[in-house]
């Protein structure tokens, strides 16, 4: 088990144990320590790798584990102990899932297959990152606002709700120079064809208000931003924050995706892979990464324990 003692719900808590089950626990403090710990676990032989933390911990374990496991990963499971735990929602795990629950589900063979997003910088020589939710534009601002919500004590669904309310207010009542309305320089293209993703006549062709992409099938709070037919990489792209779109937003998030949305500037897209060029930072599973050019592919097929 990779145990992140800094995760929100692990602070001040004692580590769980399961009678009759041998669990090797590592608590790396840096990413280099994490890579060494994963290598040691792999050398010893491992059947189940438990990730005790939030979405950011999962991202780091998957990213640093690429060089260790390649395409032959052990079965994975998540104990949701972070400020955000979107992957656990998709896997069907309850927020209070315990170590004994995970072990029981693993022994019963309750598993699902998932592929993470593989994000590779085109302009820097560094390993690809693996994560499940990537966003840019106003999504980055939303995550920053969410960190403010965390600092005043809002977490999970409450933090999402508070952040969404603040962002919508900025869009509806802010001026065009407001950073929540001005958008981000963002070139998006399908790969490997290089075909540009569609852009409506609203806003500047080189700018987008928000981009969100994921391989998850279920989102937190029951949000149905993506359509059922979208796969394998599901994208939602908003060209410009028009009031007509935001008036329909509650219905859109509940799964109503009428045909006029694309002409109005909200696109629901599917891709095998895509590229993005940004002039502002983006977010991968809760963490900022620098502006630049990136290739987004599907990572290796992973097996996760499910509830």
Region roles according to the model:
Residues 10-11, 141-142, 220-222, 284-285:
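Short helix/loop capping segments that flank catalytic or ligand/cofactor-binding pockets
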Residues 198-205, 221-307:
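ATP/nucleoside-binding phosphotransfer catalytic cores, i.e., glycine-rich phosphate-binding loops
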Residues 1-52, 56-68, 96-104:
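ATP/NTP phosphate-donor binding region
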Residues 16-19, 66-67, 147-149, 227-230, ...:
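Short, solvent-exposed amphipathic alpha-helical segments in soluble enzyme
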Residues 50, 77-79, 236:
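Hydrophobic/aromatic beta-strand patches that form the interior of the parallel beta-sheet core
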Residues 135, 139, 210-225, 288:
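Glycine-rich phosphate/pyrophosphate-binding beta-alpha loops
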Residues 2-3, 8-12, 70-207:
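Catalytic core of DAGKc-family lipid kinases
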Residues 187-189, 210-214, 236-238:
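Short, conserved beta-strand edge motifs with alternating hydrophobic and charged residues
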């Amino acid at each position: 088990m990779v145990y992140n003692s800094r995760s929100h719900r692990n602070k001040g808590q004692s580590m769980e144990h399961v009678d009759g089950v041998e669990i090797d626990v590592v608590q790396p403090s840096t990413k280099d320590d994490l890579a060494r710990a994963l290598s040691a676990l792999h050398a010893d032989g491992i059947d189940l790798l438990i990730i005790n933390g939030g979405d950011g911990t999962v991202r780091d374990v998957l990213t640093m584990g690429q060089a260790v496991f390649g395409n032959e990963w052990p079965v994975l499971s998540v104990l949701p102990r972070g400020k955000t735990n979107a992957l656990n929602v998709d896997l069907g795990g309850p927020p209070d899932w315990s170590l004994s629950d995970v072990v029981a589900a693993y022994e019963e063979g309750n598993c699902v297959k998932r592929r993470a997003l593989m994000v590779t910088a085109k302009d820097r020589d560094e390993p690809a990152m693996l994560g499940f939710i990537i966003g840019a534009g106003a999504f980055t601002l939303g995550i920053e606002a969410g960190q403010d919500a965390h600092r005043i004590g809002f977490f999970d669904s409450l933090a999402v709700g508070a952040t969404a309310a603040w962002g919508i207010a900025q869009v509806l009542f802010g001026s065009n120079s407001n950073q929540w309305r001005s958008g981000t320089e963002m070139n998006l293209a399908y790969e490997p064809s290089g075909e540009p993703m569609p852009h409506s006549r609203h806003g500047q062709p080189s700018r987008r208000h928000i981009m969100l992409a994921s391989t998850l099938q279920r989102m937190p709070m029951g949000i149905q931003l993506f359509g059922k037919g979208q796969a394998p990489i599901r994208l939602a792209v908003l060209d410009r924050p028009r009031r007509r779109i935001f008036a329909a937003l509650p219905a859109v998030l509940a799964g109503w995706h009428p045909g006029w949305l694309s002409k109005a500037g909200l696109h629901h897209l599917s891709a095998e892979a895509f590229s993005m060029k940004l002039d502002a930072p983006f977010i991968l599973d809760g963490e900022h990464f620098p502006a630049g050019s990136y290739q987004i592919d599907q990572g290796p097929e992973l097996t996760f324990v499910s509830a």
